[in-house]
Amino acid sequence: MEIGEIVLNFVGNNEINLIIMRIINCLKAAVLAVLVGSSLWSCSGDKGKTRYVPVVLDGEEKWSILDTKTGDVLCQNDFDEMPSVVEDGMFVVRTKSGYYECYKIDDSKNAIGKGKYTQLGTFGDEDVTFAVKEGQGIMIVNKKFEEVKKLPKKVSRTSGFSEGLAAFCKDGKWGFLDTKGEEVIPAKYDQATPFSDGRAFVLKNEKILIIDKKGETVKSMSLDKYNPIAFYHNGYAPIAKGDKVVFLDKNGEEAFTNSKMESDGCYEINDGKTVFRRDDRYGLISTDGEVLVRPKYLSLEYANKNRYIACNDDFKFGVIDAKGDVVIDFEYSGLKQTSVVADRYFAKDGNSWVLINEKGEEQTKDSYKELNLAGSHVDVFYSEVAEEPVFEPEPDDYSVDSAVVEEVAEAY
């Protein structure tokens, strides 16, 4: 599972899409995340690239999986419910009975992980994940779905694994477990984010702490003075300091800042550059402070090296490079780059999505009425026997697909 990778499949009325995007940008500037998917969000599109994307073909009702490299449709119309994004050739899907099963991409007929799992994570870069069976606590399972460890009843919640560690909550405090389920950092924090780039933000006694994977404090900051914006990425983390944005290095020291960057924008360093917000518009700036693309777009998102997805004032999406030159014309109502193939984009025009290259040429004969770009079904796991009462979301709350945004758009 990638850190903070919450990707909404923007569809429908573009004015509503932009409102939703701005709401998300406001959430990004909230204080500390309790867990992935809460307040600290990944700002760019370089995480979570995948070869396989769940889709619903136009004219169909069931889910298939698209190979974005070959254009082939796999597991065609095999699933009533939306599968998770495929990670390491495996994916999770909910059955009609409401339980989760795991399949391999080359065999969608035979589940490798059966059982009455009410929650089941994907494996990502790890050989283990979290799972919860009906009426039981949280457990760790391997790729053969053998139980590695059943966590104590006092453990009420966990995040997914990231960099070999997972945040967990016990007796109302947060710490970190390793992939064997051992407590490597004791539960002593009020809140905690997952690890990214070897660092995590935690909250303790009204102080924001940056800790390393040994649990040692790298930096302590006042909650009144600093406000984390996003996770560490490529060695830096953006943080709001009053109305300014400063980037902290991995020692927690201020590495650079720029007065042109507003604190409620979305910042993450990629290739020595970051998207920045000014006067309600987005542009591109280097870490040296040079404005590369003036802030003129309603949204701007890092897609790949030297490629950025932008939305203009006509609510049309296109792709620009780091000089601001147009690579893909602004003629689509939606655009996403999630494929491991760098020049493959999902583009939306009307009610359908198509897979295109940078020349705007369609790469498959099919079009798609729905995509799952949201990642895993479950990013936070809840014990069903925890001694500490916690809010447990309904299964449908675990992921966000195109229908969610379409319902919002129709309501307006």
Regions found by a protein language model. Name each.
Residues 1, 11, 24, 402-406:
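Glycine-centered signal
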Residues 1-20:
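Short, Lys/Arg-enriched N-terminal segments with co-localized hydrophobic residues
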Residues 9, 28, 43-44, 99:
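Hydrophobic, helix-prone linear segments
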Residues 11-12, 16, 38, 44-49, ...:
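Intrinsically disordered low-complexity regions specifically enriched for long asparagine
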Residues 19-30:
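Bacterial N-terminal signal peptides that target proteins for export
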Residues 30-39:
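Bacterial N-terminal signal peptides
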Residues 44-394, 412:
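Residue-level detector of conserved, function-critical positions
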Residues 395-412:
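Long, low-complexity, intrinsically disordered segments
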